[in-house]
């Protein structure tokens, strides 16, 4: 009975630690993704010349200006 109690407690502790580690990894992944999106916005902004003054997309090297960053626009296929 005592051994069963020890094994149960050990199992519960290890499963809790696994969930906690998974949550930590997920949180780090989400923060990394946010940092990457911000970095991509900065790179697009700097490389394409998108600025606060002109948000109509004329100054982008491709695509359109959105949130002060240049983004590619998908071309629509023309129907024949």
Swiss-Prot record:
Disulphide-bridged cysteine pairs: 48-61, 50-65, 60-70
Residues making up the propeptide: 23-36, 77-80
GO molecular function terms noted in the UniProt entry: toxin activity
Localization of this protein: Secreted
Taxonomic superkingdom: Eukaryota
Tissue spec. comment: Expressed by the venom duct.
GO cellular component terms listed in the entry, alphabetical order: extracellular region
Keyword RNA-binding: no
Record's signal peptide: 1-22
Keywords of the record: Cleavage on pair of basic residues, Disulfide bond, Knottin, Neurotoxin, Secreted, Signal, Toxin
Free-text note regarding domains: The presence of a 'disulfide through disulfide knot' structurally defines this protein as a knottin. The cysteine framework is VI/VII (C-C-CC-C-C).
Name by which UniProt lists this protein: Turripeptide VI/VII-01
Organism: Gemmula speciosa (Splendid gem-turris)
């Amino acid at each position: 009975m005592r051994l069963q109690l020890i094994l149960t407690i050990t199992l519960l502790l290890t499963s809790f630690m696994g969930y906690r580690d998974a949550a930590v990894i997920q949180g780090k992944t989400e923060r990394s993704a946010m940092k990457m999106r911000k970095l991509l916005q900065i790179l697009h902004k700097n490389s394409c010349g998108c600025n606060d003054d002109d948000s109509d997309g004329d100054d982008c090297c491709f695509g359109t200006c959105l949130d002060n960053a240049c983004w590619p626009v998908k071309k629509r296929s023309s129907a024949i």
